[in-house]
């Protein structure tokens, strides 16, 4: 992937064109950048969120850390705390980090977590399950009140096909450094 990205960069520089033009051009005029940070102990996370809010960020993704790894009270404390710090006027997404080799979250946990996240107006719930758990992602998407995202760790187009065909996600997130 690194070589592929570098070659496209060189091609864009040689032609004097943004490489997006070679892939069909601009789809929108603006994108929403978001600050991404670990769900650390609330005091530390809140300090980081406050600093990032002060830098002008209006969208945030909090993830990994202890979320889904201790208990549901801890999960809600983290999300409630983040929402309080950034306010209701900011976008908030949550990444459970289900691609972690030691991830224990299951479908029941993910459904319950998604309902809790809806209470805090979370924009999407990312990696709520292990990355290859197609059947559970399909069921989670059916039951979740918040959009479900994933596919970040998949590396080949064939890996994406069943998730797309079965509509397992509301948001597909390929990582260009992994898929080439």
What function would you assign to each model-found segment?
Residues 25, 65, 98, 128-130, ...:
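Residue-level "edge-of-site" marker
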Residues 120-129:
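A short, conserved beta-to-alpha structural element at the edge of catalytic cores
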Residues 57, 122, 168-169:
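A structural motif
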Residues 1-119, 135, 143:
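N-terminal capping/lid subdomain adjacent to the active-site entrance of alpha/beta enzymes
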Residues 131-180:
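Catalytic alpha/beta core domains of metabolic enzymes, predominantly
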Residues 1, 72, 103, 127, ...:
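Hydrophobic alpha-helical scaffolding
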Residues 59-61, 126, 173:
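Conserved beta-strand positions in the central sheet of alpha/beta enzyme cores
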